[in-house]
Regions:
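Nucleic-acid nuclease catalytic cores
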Residues: 79-125
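Solvent-exposed, charged helical/coil patches
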Residues: 1-44, 115, 120-125
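Short, isolated positions in well-ordered beta-strands
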Residues: 45, 60, 75-76
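Conserved catalytic cores of phosphodiester-cleaving nucleases, focusing on short active-site segments
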Residues: 22, 66-84, 95
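Basic/aromatic recognition patch in beta-strand/loop cores that engages polyanionic ligands
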Residues: 59-66
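A short acidic/basic microdomain associated with nuclease active sites
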Residues: 39-56
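Acidic pyrophosphate-coordinating catalytic loop
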Residues: 55-59, 115
């Protein structure tokens, strides 16, 4: 499956979840429902995937967990916050670098229209 097709499926699934649940919940219910929706669509998804951090011979095994990794190609960072902040953008860029996954999405469910809560990231490095 091509990266644009995967991204389209993720966004479509997130829109379906948001349409059903609406804004205002905490992050976890959105995560669980999005995982379920992706599985219903036949999309492979891992939740809370650990990524080891390596620093000069030190390996931190459990210090980083990615909200979702879809088809081993896209990191999905879920939010239920008033707005996506620069720290959230820096967070997903760091996750992409540390995991060697070059594509990411931030999906913020705490918005009236979900299209206003989605940002896509591509690391060209």
């Amino acid at each position: 499956m091509e990266i644009n097709d995967i991204t389209k499926e993720i966004i479509g699934a997130a829109i379906e979840v948001h349409k059903t649940l609406g804004p205002g919940l905490l992050e976890k219910p959105y995560e669980l429902c999005l995982i379920h929706e992706l599985k219903l669509r036949g999309i492979k998804c891992e939740s809370q995937k650990p990524v080891p951090i390596q620093y000069k011979g030190l390996v931190l095994d459990d210090s980083l967990k990615l909200d979702l990794v879809v088809e081993n190609k896209v990191i999905v960072e879920l939010k239920a916050t008033k707005e996506i902040l620069p720290v959230h953008r820096a967070q997903i860029m760091s996750y992409m670098k540390l995991s060697s996954i070059n594509n990411g999405l931030i999906i913020n469910f705490h918005v009236k229209l979900l299209k206003d809560g989605i940002e896509r990231f591509i690391d060209h490095a």
